[in-house]
Curated annotation (Swiss-Prot):
Catalytic reaction annotation: ATP + H2O = ADP + phosphate + H(+)
BP-aspect Gene Ontology terms: DNA recombination; DNA repair
Keyword annotations: ATP-binding, Cytoplasm, DNA damage, DNA recombination, DNA repair, DNA-binding, Hydrolase, Nucleotide-binding
Job of this protein: The RuvA-RuvB-RuvC complex processes Holliday junction (HJ) DNA during genetic recombination and DNA repair, while the RuvA-RuvB complex plays an important role in the rescue of blocked DNA replication forks via replication fork reversal (RFR). RuvA specifically binds to HJ cruciform DNA, conferring on it an open structure. The RuvB hexamer acts as an ATP-dependent pump, pulling dsDNA into and through the RuvAB complex. RuvB forms 2 homohexamers on either side of HJ DNA bound by 1 or 2 RuvA tetramers; 4 subunits per hexamer contact DNA at a time.
Region (Large ATPase domain (RuvB-L)), start-end ranges: 4-186
Family indicated by similarity: Belongs to the RuvB family.
Biological source species: Aliivibrio fischeri (strain ATCC 700601 / ES114)
Gene Ontology CC terms: cytoplasm; Holliday junction resolvase complex
Binding sites annotated in the UniProt record for Mg(2+): T71
InterPro entries assigned to the protein according to its UniProt record, in alphabetical order: AAA+_ATPase, AAA_lid_4, DNA_helicase_Holl-junc_RuvB, P-loop_NTPase, RuvB-like_N, RuvB_C, WH-like_DNA-bd_sf, WH_DNA-bd_sf
Name of the featured protein: Holliday junction branch migration complex subunit RuvB
Residues holding DNA: R296, R315, R320
Length: 337
């Protein structure tokens, strides 16, 4: 598989080496999909049932933090169903005609995957409702008094929507998904299997303890685990004999400024800012964003979820508060209040 990808990359300079590697290590079947056991077992049943009835799979909404494999799961569903998948994202679909063009080109039981579906415009969303429910498009032709509505029948299809913000979806859209799956942060042992599988796909020499070291610092996120693996590979090839042991992985990750808890520079910057500038909180999100020079959405969607899940940060009605665990991690005395 990777050799074919390398040939494609050689012919097309727009392909980056990182993209080629991503495609090579991405699982194609549910059997290769590590972790998320509840999602995998449910999807196996739903897919088999749809195949037995020779129907399109019910519309599927996948939500969870970034990097947990929403796009990967959508492609796996397409492979398991044996159908084509067309991929787009919410911000790209600016007009109703953009969505109509995609829908009218679908074949029976095909999949339309919309990433960041919470960012669909209301106009485009209105077109989706009859398409999802009745497999019909309602299109307005002409303008003013001469305008008329025509209905276009669509083949049965599956819409897969992915979002990091399920709460931002409108109720009418959310209610039209027959299957809703939430992806959780991965356990360390599941990430270790993912790292080891990726290393095998890339023909890397990697010890199990080396894979464990990478997995422990990957913030429960496969995308981060695979990114760290590529950088550890670089370090091992330049500074050693290419074999990735626990010691080599530790040195490489320390060089990358990723600590034993998986915190990177921005994680530490956020926690330290709350502790040192705001006496541990509570402090509002706007103040944190100004203090660390980061966007609100990035803090809320990318940085905070893992810190909260690990018990280092709390969201309260009055603002963000760091926990005692954060003070212990940094060796800082908690101020008396």
């Amino acid at each position: 598989m990777i050799e074919a990808d390398r040939l494609i990359a050689a012919d097309n300079p727009t392909f980056r080496e990182e993209d080629v590697i991503d495609r090579a290590i991405r699982p194609k079947k549910l059997d290769d999909y590590q972790g998320q056991d509840h999602v995998r077992s449910q999807m196996e049943i739903f897919i088999k049932a749809a195949q037995m009835r020779e129907e399109a799979l019910d519309h599927l909404l996948i939500f969870g933090p970034p990097g947990l494999g929403k796009t990967t799961l959508a492609n796996i569903v397409a492979n398991e169903m044996g159908v084509n998948i067309r991929t787009t994202s919410g911000p790209v679909l600016e007009k109703a005609g953009d969505l109509a063009a995609l829908l009218t080109n679908l074949e029976e039981n095909d999949i339309l995957f919309i990433d960041e579906i919470h960012r669909l415009s209301p106009m485009v969303e209105e077109v989706l409702y009859p398409a999802m429910e009745d497999y019909q498009l309602d299109i307005m032709i002409g303008e003013g008094p001469a305008a008329r509505s025509i209905k276009i029948d669509l083949p049965p299809f599956t819409l897969i929507g992915a979002t990091t913000r399920a709460g931002s979806l409108t109720s009418p859209l959310r209610d039209r998904f027959g299957i809703v799956q939430r992806l959780e942060y991965y356990k360390v042992e599941d990430l270790q299997h993912i790292v080891q599988r990726s290393a095998d796909c890339l023909n890397l020499s990697m010890e199990s303890e080396g894979a464990l070291e990478v997995a422990r610092r990957a913030r429960g996120t496969p995308r981060i685990a695979n990114r760290l693996l590529r950088r550890v590979r670089d370090y091992a090839e330049v500074m050693s004999d290419g074999n990735i042991s626990s010691e080599i992985a530790d040195k490489a990750l320390n060089m990358l400024d990723v600590d034993v808890r998986g915190f990177d520079y921005m994680d530490r910057k956020l926690l330290l800012a709350i502790m040192e500038k705001f006496d541990g909180g509570p402090v509002g999100l706007d103040n944190i964003a100004a203090a660390i020079g980061e966007e609100r959405d990035t803090i809320e969607d990318v940085i905070e979820p893992y810190l909260i899940q690990q018990g280092y940060l709390q969201r309260t009605p009055r603002g963000r508060i760091v926990s005692d665990r954060a003070y212990l991690h940094f060796g800082i005395d908690k101020p008396d209040k």
